[in-house]
Each structure stands twice: as C-alpha cells, then as structure tokens.
C-alpha cells in the first residue's frame, strides 16, 4: 500500500520548495478509504486535510492535474469510490450537475494506463451518466442545466439564486424555495453554465473514444459532442466582452468571467485560436492569480471582502488557466500563476484551498444565510487540488508533457529565471520517467515516446 511520488528540482529555490510542499500535501491526504463501488478498503486521495472523502469533482480534477503521474492505483481507487449504482446501473456520484466530470479523470487515467477492466467499467459509467442527465437536464437549446463546475455554494451565482430553502448555502436548496422559477424538468436549477457544458462536451468526446476502443459505434457520441460545442459557441460567446459569458437562464444573463469555463473552452478545443487570443486579452487576472468568477457579485463587496465562489482565487482553477495560457503562447500569463502560487505555498508551508484576490492571504470568502447574513467561510488546509494544480504547471508547463491518443510528447519550457530543471519518477503506466532539462544544451528540444514503456526511463532535453 505504498505511494509512488515524483520529484522536482531546479536552480530556483522557490519552485523547489513549493514542489516539495505540494508533494507533502498530496501524500498526507492519501488514506485508506472504502465507499461507492470500491469493494475493499484501498488508498484513496482525500480532497484535503479538512476533508474525509475524495469527492467526485476533486478526484477527477486531481487526476487531470497531476495525480496520474504520482500513483495511478490511487487514482483508480478514488475514481471507483465516488461511483454508485442507481436503478441497477453504475453512474458517477457527487453533485448532479457536474458529476460527469468523472469522465475526464477516468480518461486521464486510461491515457496513461492500459487497463482493460477499468476501460469497460469507465465506458459503462460514462454512458449511463450521460443518458441519465440527457433525460433530466438537457434542454431544447442543446445545453445542460445546472450549476457551474464545483460551484456548490450560492456565492457563485447572481442575486436571483441567493434565496434558498431553510436559508442553506448550497445551490441545491434553491429549487424548493423558488417553485415559480424552477425548471420544469430535472432537479430544478434552470441556469446553464459555461464550465459544466464544456465538461459535457469533453465527456461526449471521451465516450466516443472509449466506444471505438471497445469496438462499438462512436458516431452518436461524436455527433452529440459537435452539437454541444456548437451550442456553447452560439449561446455563450459574447462579442462585446471578447469572451464567453458565465451563465444564463430564461430571464437573465451573467457576463462575468469564469476561470474554469474559459480554461476548459481553450484546453478542450471549443474555442478556436481567435477566441483563445481574445479570451486571454479580455479576462481580468488579479495580482494573486485568476479569480474563480470576476467580478465578485456586489452583495459580497463589503469592505475588503469578496464572495467565496466569486472573486476569490482558487488554485485548482489557476492550474487549468496557467496551462491553457502557456499552450496558447501567453508565457507571462503562465508564469504569473506559477510563481504567485509558489510564493504563497512557501510562505504558508501549505497549498491552501482559497486565497484573497488583493492581499494574497489564505482566505475563505463570504458566504451567506438569510437569517445569519454574510459570514466568512474557512479556507481549508492542504487542499489536494491546489497542490496537484501546482504540479500540473510543472508537468504540463515546465516539462511540456502532452498526452496524445498514441504517445507522449515532451516539449519543455523554462521560465526566464530557470536554467535547469529535473523531474524524477513520473509514473507512466508501468514505467517511471525522469526528465532533465537544460537551457541551450545539445539535447533535443522535443521528443515523442510510446506509452507502453516499462521500468526506469531517462531523457535529456534542451530549451
């Protein structure tokens, strides 16, 4: 039941310390756990020091960020533990609106591991989960209703969505308190959000690829993916702001910037090159990283406070934004997130859940209850997806790793203040890969390696 850990070393002390802190936070959150469809107690990755469960979205995002390069068995265990059986069918568990993000974590695992048993399991879960929410939440415009990815708190949403049953803080309490405004089908939250619909697009693409691998017809999923992509571009793109809107329903639209949604649109290929350039140009980034939603909704702008899910800086979103910026050629945008997060981690000796957008301090943001009013929520300690987000910047940024359907491309990049970097013990299936990167050496600048390697493999590269 050991844990496999990668290592990072460079000639930049801040990055080195931050990487060690991130690795420590991740390792400390790996615990024996049994839930969902996991039949026996196994090591799984908890969401953070203050959490006792993996959570579906956290598990998938951790896998997408970096955890598959740490220990793929822990990823596999965690993914199975957040699934459940409903009406005799295996589906992804968790909050209903973004539970399909499970598909992306499963695909990341399968992209690095030839696991026939899990491939069949994943296809079954994804197929059933898509069918369930197509029946319940898919609207006539080709978009899925429900909250934003990870936006469980009402601080993520406009004033309309702040009135909830029993004055609860969760968006799932909204339909019961607003029977005249709830959607006629599904759970009842009528909004459509950018991030969630981007994830559905990705899930359709993944379902199509798994169908092909398993010898089934993929055409239905490919067609649905294209329809979802077209619907996102038609309904969310805003020429006036130069980026995608955050959300809309039948009565109002919110054109705030959503970090995860914009990042997903760029990373998943929903946005073309012109749109990506426009998004980067027209998205506000604070001195301490991209805020989850900006601007913060005005009801939370009390003194120096911001909303928990609107205005605050969440590192798991920073990770996606940083990688998207680098892949689209915005080096400055990548380095801002990389070094900002690294300095805060070294300062605090941990990767916290959330930070203040102006001061950079560990900060949980304002939430609200009608009877209690506004109150400051805790920023949880040693958050797994904050730590894996930093490692994502190392793996996909500095190492420049890109996973294709057939191979792994390594095209490194070094920040201007870094001339040497090493990554050791990255897990890729049955292999442990080490990468040494030097500026202006005679080594190749890009290599492509197969996925079916075994044992220890070392590569030298130059930038």
Regions found by a protein language model. Name each.
Residues 53-59, 63-168, 172, 193-201, ...:
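Aromatic-rich carbohydrate-recognition surfaces in CAZymes
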Residues 5-19, 66-79, 110-127, 141, ...:
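Structural helix-adjacent loops and short alpha-helical linkers that scaffold large soluble proteins
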Residues 5-53, 73-92, 139-191, 229-315, ...:
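Extended glycan-interaction surfaces of carbohydrate-active proteins
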Residues 194-236:
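Active-site neighborhood of glycoside hydrolase catalytic domains
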Residues 320, 324-463:
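Non-catalytic C-terminal accessory modules of carbohydrate-active enzymes
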Residues 10, 50, 113-117, 121, ...:
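A structural signal for alpha-helical segments
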């Amino acid at each position: 039941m050991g844990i496999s850990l990668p290592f990072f070393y460079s000639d930049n002390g801040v990055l080195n310390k931050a990487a060690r802190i991130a690795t420590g936070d991740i390792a400390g959150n790996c615990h024996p756990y049994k839930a969902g469809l996991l039949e026996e107690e196994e090591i799984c990755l908890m969401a953070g020091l203050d959490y006792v469960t993996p959570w579906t979205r956290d598990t998938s995002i951790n896998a997408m960020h970096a955890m598959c390069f740490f220990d793929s068995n822990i990823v596999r265990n965690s993914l199975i533990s957040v699934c459940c059986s409903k009406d005799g069918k295996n589906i992804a568990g968790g909050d209903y609106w973004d539970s399909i993000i499970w598909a992306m974590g499963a695909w990341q695992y399968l992209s690095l591991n030839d696991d026939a048993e899990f491939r069949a399991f994943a296809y079954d879960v994804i197929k059933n989960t898509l069918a369930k929410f197509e029946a319940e939440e898919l609207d006539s415009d080709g978009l899925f209703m429900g909250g934003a990815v990870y936006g469980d708190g009402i601080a993520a949403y406009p004033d309309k969505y702040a009135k909830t049953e029993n004055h609860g803080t969760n968006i799932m309490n909204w339909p019961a308190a607003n029977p005249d405004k709830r959607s006629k089908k599904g759970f009842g939250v009528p909004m459509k959000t950018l991030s969630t619909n981007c994830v559905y697009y990705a899930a359709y693409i993944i379902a199509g690829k798994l169908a092909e691998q398993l010898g089934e017809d993929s055409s239905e999923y490919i067609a649905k993916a294209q329809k979802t992509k077209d619907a996102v571009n038609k309904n969310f793109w805003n020429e006036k702001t130069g980026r995608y809107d955050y959300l809309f329903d039948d009565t109002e639209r919110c054109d705030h910037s959503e970090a995860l949604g914009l990042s997903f649109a760029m990373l998943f290929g929903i946005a073309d090159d012109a749109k990506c350039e426009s998004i980067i140009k027209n998205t506000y980034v604070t001195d301490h990283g991209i805020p989850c939603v900006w601007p913060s909704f005005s009801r939370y702008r009390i003194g120096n406070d911001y909303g928990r899910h609107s205005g605050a800086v969440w590192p798991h979103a920073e990770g996606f934004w940083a990688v998207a910026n680098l892949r689209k050629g915005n080096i400055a945008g990548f380095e801002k997130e990389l070094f900002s997060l690294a300095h805060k981690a070294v300062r605090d000796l941990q990767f916290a859940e959330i930070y203040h957008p102006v001061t950079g301090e560990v900060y949980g943001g304002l939430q609200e209850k009608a009877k209690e009013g506004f109150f400051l929520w805790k920023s949880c300690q040693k958050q797994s997806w904050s730590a894996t987000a930093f490692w994502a910047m190392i793996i996909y940024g500095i190492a420049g790793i890109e996973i294709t359907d057939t191979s792994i491309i390594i095209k490194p990049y070094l920040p201007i203040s870094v001339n040497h970097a090493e990554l050791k013990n990255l897990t890729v299936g049955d292999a442990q890969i080490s990468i040494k990167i030097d500026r202006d050496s005679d080594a190749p600048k890009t290599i492509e390696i197969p996925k079916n390697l075994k044992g220890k493999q070392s590569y030298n590269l130059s930038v």
